[in-house]
Amino acid sequence: MDPYKVIIRPLVTEKAVSLIEKENKLTFIVDRKATKQDIKRAVEEMFNVKVEKVNTLITMKGEKKAYVKLRPEYNASEIAARLGLF
């Protein structure tokens, strides 16, 4: 799957911002058909980082949300700043 079709948009909520600061995690709304491997590959390719873990869930709205934990050597705050979240 094309990485630019996997990730639809970053999610900016109070919880998402606290996860960036405390747990080095980014939150995205992703394509409903995307697997965890697709999401990992897309984030690594788009942002030039290494992903440690991906957790996904389907929201009540029917969207798929992905929590992407980056490896300790990468900083989620820097990626968020590049995306314009801060």
From Swiss-Prot:
InterPro entries for this protein: Nucleotide-bd_a/b_plait_sf, Ribosomal_uL23, Ribosomal_uL23-like, Ribosomal_uL23/eL15/eS24_sf
Matches recorded under SUPFAM superfamilies: Ribosomal proteins S24e, L23 and L15e
GO cellular component: ribonucleoprotein complex; ribosome
Mitochondrion is among the record's keywords: no
The entry's keywords: Ribonucleoprotein, Ribosomal protein, RNA-binding, rRNA-binding
Function: Binds to 23S rRNA. One of the proteins that surrounds the polypeptide exit tunnel on the outside of the ribosome.
Quaternary structure note: Part of the 50S ribosomal subunit. Contacts protein L29.
Protein name per UniProt: Large ribosomal subunit protein uL23
Organism from which the protein derives: Thermococcus gammatolerans (strain DSM 15229 / JCM 11827 / EJ3)
Name of the encoding gene: rpl23
